[in-house]
């Protein structure tokens, strides 16, 4: 068991220790080369096929797999595509994403592959998650709200071009949080301190 104060970093450390002590296999998505390979062969290949004009690619900084695999394939498609990581502000957790300032850098993450990191706060992620549902009918989770908020920031600074962002978590995980119905301050506190599924 881990103390809640150690968050997902503590859980990863305990899982690695238990696997090592007991001779168990741990898929370890943060360090497994199959993770970025799946995005190289799948996610990015779909983007190249369906949106070859992409100029900017935005994904949340979680395990690093989406960013690493997609960036490699997209830069092969066109070297000038910008790859941007959406990262939560330190001390302002966004469910599903991780701040590198919290001390854990996924082994598969190569920061040199990123053109930029943009920070996003939990409140902005929640507000965009609500907008996605209300305005676009997209029932996404908070990390997806963070990514689309980042996409909007990037697009606002562009005079032309195409931004692609990854909506990777579902709203069903947050049904008990009151994300779409309760006061934003109350939801922000619940999302900061909870696991919903």
Predicted features, each with a name:
Residues 60-71, 143-151, 174:
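Short glycine/serine/threonine-rich phosphate/pyrophosphate-binding segments
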Residues 152-197:
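Phosphate-binding loop/pocket of nucleotide- and phosphate-handling active sites
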Residues 112-158, 180:
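Active-site-adjacent helical/loop segments in soluble small-molecule enzymes
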Residues 80-82, 162:
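Residues at the starts of beta-strands that form the adenosine-phosphate
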Residues 27-30, 60-62, 85-87, 164-168:
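Short beta-strand segments
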Residues 71-78, 155:
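Surface-exposed amphipathic alpha-helices with a cationic face
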Residues 38-40, 69-73, 95-99, 175-179:
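Short acidic, glycine/serine/threonine-rich loops at helix termini
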Residues 1-56, 86-133:
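Small/polar-residue-rich loop-to-helix segments that shape phosphate-bearing ligand pockets
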